[in-house]
Amino acid sequence: MKEKFKSWAFSKEHGKCDVITLIIYLLGVCTVSFFHEPWFDEAQSWAIARSGTIKEILFEIPHYEGHPPLWHLILVPFAKLGAPYELSLAVVNIFFMTLAVAVLLFKSPFPKLIRCLLPFNFFLFYQYGVISRPYSVLTLSFFLAAAFYPSRNKKPLRYVFSLAFMCMIHSFGIIFAGGLCVVWLSEIILSLIHIS
């Protein structure tokens, strides 16, 4: 019995367990989000998306908000069309975090047990899954960058897209993407030096 569990837990195969984990994650986040009352910074993002013009969101608001405009631009269609504030904010956030968890479950090289437990840690489940902030989109961009990293030299556009996506969502993303670009560039330079 122990050997069977070990072979299952440390298997790197993707399949039913990942789908079940994703469904449980989605149901759990939806349930907790139903009882979550948005915090002031969540409401502020919505108010900016509702009241700001596209020009203000792109060129003025990022200067005092401290992060790039993509999160506000994502919220704009819902806010401007008069969609219910709390429901729309939760749906947008849950959508991006569910995509992020799907990338984690179906593209990561971790053993099955770790993959199936990771989505339920405090940050991925509550801080990023329930509280509607740009971190849900930032998490998706991190996981996409990690998924595309092994093939970055053969298919660089996917990797560059994930880094650009990272830069457009949050100031932390700019720092991380910049660091990853420096590492990638140094790898390219070292490989060129090694060839010649």
Regions found by a protein language model. Name each.
Residues 26, 113-125, 139:
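Transmembrane and membrane-interface helices of multi-pass
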Residues 46-49, 61-91, 95:
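Short hydrophobic/aromatic helix or loop-helix immediately within or flanking a transmembrane segment
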Residues 1-29, 109-112:
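Start-transfer (signal-anchor) and selected internal transmembrane alpha helices
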Residues 23, 91-116:
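Transmembrane-helix motifs of polytopic, lipid-linked glycan transferases
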Residues 130-136:
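Short acidic/glycine- and proline-prone juxtamembrane loop motifs at membrane-interface regions
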Residues 193-195:
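Conserved small/polar residues in nucleotide/adenosyl-binding loops
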Residues 124-126, 143-144, 156-181:
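Membrane-interface alpha helices of multi-pass inner-membrane proteins
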Residues 27-45:
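Helix-to-loop transition at the C-terminal end of transmembrane segments
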